[in-house]
Every structure is written in structure tokens, then in C-alpha cells.
């Protein structure tokens, strides 16, 4: 599983100095030549960030053992069998002519890094930059093809890709959308067969706290916080008490700056809803119908009516000794997260339903670092079936270090399973095993 952080940046590196609306209020939309059709938005990247759900199952980049190339592969949502996307008879799946061929490794990196994103009947192929730092090697690209890999064509090629971007990608059947943030600059980019375009930009005198938080109808949902000044960091070597006081001062400063909810359409037209999100929000906002749900770290819960622009506070989640933290929205209005209990070294993992307040603690199925129990990890929602990491097999392997000397280390490969969402939420762990072509997804 790979959480890839990259964006097309030959266009982006100059963006940090681009003109953007001044002030801390809502930015004006950028002009566009022609309006895009009003098609419903949906998220195309999975919770794990490494693949996408579409016709036929879970699409992702597969790395054959000891091969210096990568292929497109699909996990069947019924059988759990992973297969190479190409179905041409006699194809060896190791040349550019293969419908599933993703790309070859380049000098400086033996690993082909990238993602596949399904947007209805289209498959997008996003190759990340070579290397661990900003790279000038022109091996990055964004392609689009039919869902079976045929009719593939390049949208953007070459350039420099910074490894800094949102892992969330969205589509409307005609274009892909993602965001980029660097210090005081934020932008939303639209990708389609006409290329790539910045449809919205925002700049601030402070760090820009803006993000895409979801979709509703034909619009992206944005959160943006007004400028505020954080206290300076404590001196190096400060006591735990001083750091705790600093953390509380940061929270107080942040709470004084409202967190706004806004909408952005496919052309970059920005609309502030007038709604204010919770001051200490957990930053994951599932949407169901016209309702957006929000949770504070304290457990307070809200429902926002996006059509009526109203908000109501719901019954709080059960009280816990620590704060609630949530990470993903894996299925419907369910979110996953954890809370730390004061005085404990570990944390408790859970699933929460922010619509009805349900609380679920799934039974652990694997051990982190071979000793810490962990619950199943969500990979993708395949309709009414969940693809999950349910185990971890540890093994020793060897590699060559930067000094040219071999060394051995312990790593793990995940074990995956499929389960009906209804069964998992009822407490079942009766998985259909996923059969992989290689070591891992």
C-alpha cells in the first residue's frame, strides 16, 4: 500500500509566486474560457491513496517481482483474484505494447511509482517523479485511457513534480481534480484531455489552511480558515509542561479564526456557504445526500444541510478519556480513527458513524511491529464490499545500502480480504481471501 504524494508541477513550482486574491476572506474565482458541464463529483482515490474503485474491482499499480517495470492490475470484488489488466492473447506483459504497461524504472530509481484512478468509463494513469526529492528527470506523466487500458493517450508529460500534494483525487466524468499547497499558497487543479489548469488559487500572509474536504452534487467542498497568528515554538529542550502550554495556546489562537465551508464548481466558481465548521474539528467530513457531518475532538457532532445552508448539533459521541481523532471516511458516513487514553502508551482504534452516532471497535487481526494489536485497515470500498488489510506477514529481506554494502532488515507483506460491508459492521470477520500476483498491493 502506498500513500503517494505528488502533483504535476512544471505548472506548480511557479504557482507559489502567482498572483492570488488578497485578504483572509473568500478568494474570487479565476476566469474560464468555457464552462464545463455540470456533472456530479465523486472521489476517485481510495482511502489508502494508492488505487481506485471502478468497473471490475480495485485498480492499482502492480510491481512484478524483480522487474524494472510496473503494470496496471485489478482485484476482482467477488473472487478476490488479482489479475493484470491486459487480456490480449499471447501478451507477455513486459513491453510498452501491453495494454497494462504502466512504465519502466529510470536511472536513479529502481521503483516505478504511481497511481491509477477510475472516473466512470475512464482510467487515468499518474506516474510520480523519480527519486525522493524534487527531480528534474522527465519521466512523470498523466495518461487517460478506456477502462480496459485501450485508446490510451497522454494529457501531461515531463516537467518537475514536487512530492507535496493532497492524496485526494476527484472526478466528474470529464475531468480530474486535486489540490496543491505550499506554505502560503493553495490551488485546485483540473486535469482533462485539454491539459491541466489552475481553476482556483488562494494566497495568505500566513500559512494557508485550505483543503478539499469532499464533494456535493457537481461541486467540490472546501474548508478554509481565516488568518491567525500562532505562538512561537518553545526553546529547544523545553519541558513537557511548557510544550503542553504551547499546544493549548495554539488551539486557543486557532479557535479564534473561523473555519469556513465553501463550494467550488468544475470551472473554479467559488461560493462561500456562510456556514462555519467546528473550531477544533477532526477534519474528516462524510457527506450523505444533502448532509455533511462533522466531529470535534471532544466528541461533539454536527449535521450541515448543504441545500438549506443550515446546521444542527447532534447528540455527542460517547465520552472517552482522551480526544477523538479520525483519519478516513471508508464507507458511507462511517469514519475510522483512534483516541489516546492519558497515561497509556497505545491508542484505541474504532469506527464511528457520524450520522447516527454508532460506535464500533473491531477485533484486532494483525500485529504492528510484531507486538501491537491492530484492527483491519480499509483499502477500498467496492460498492457493498470492503477490501481490507487483515493481516501482516513479517519476513527478513536484504538490500544494498548507500555505502554499497548489503544489509538485512525485517519488513512485512500485508494479507488482504474481502467482506460485505454489512457483515463487517455487524462484527463479522469472515473474509474472502485476496489472491495476489506478487507480494503486496
Describe the predicted segments one by one.
Residues 1-4:
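Positively charged n-region of N-terminal signal peptides that target proteins for export
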Residues 58-61, 125-127, 177-179, 221-224, ...:
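Residue position within the beta-strands of beta-propeller blades
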Residues 17-26:
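Bacterial lipoprotein signal-peptidase II cleavage site
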Residues 12-15:
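C-terminal motif of bacterial Sec signal peptides marking the signal peptidase cleavage site
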Residues 42-53, 95-116, 160-172, 205-217, ...:
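Repeated scaffold domains used in trafficking and secretory/extracellular systems
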Residues 113-189:
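A generic tandem-repeat structural signature
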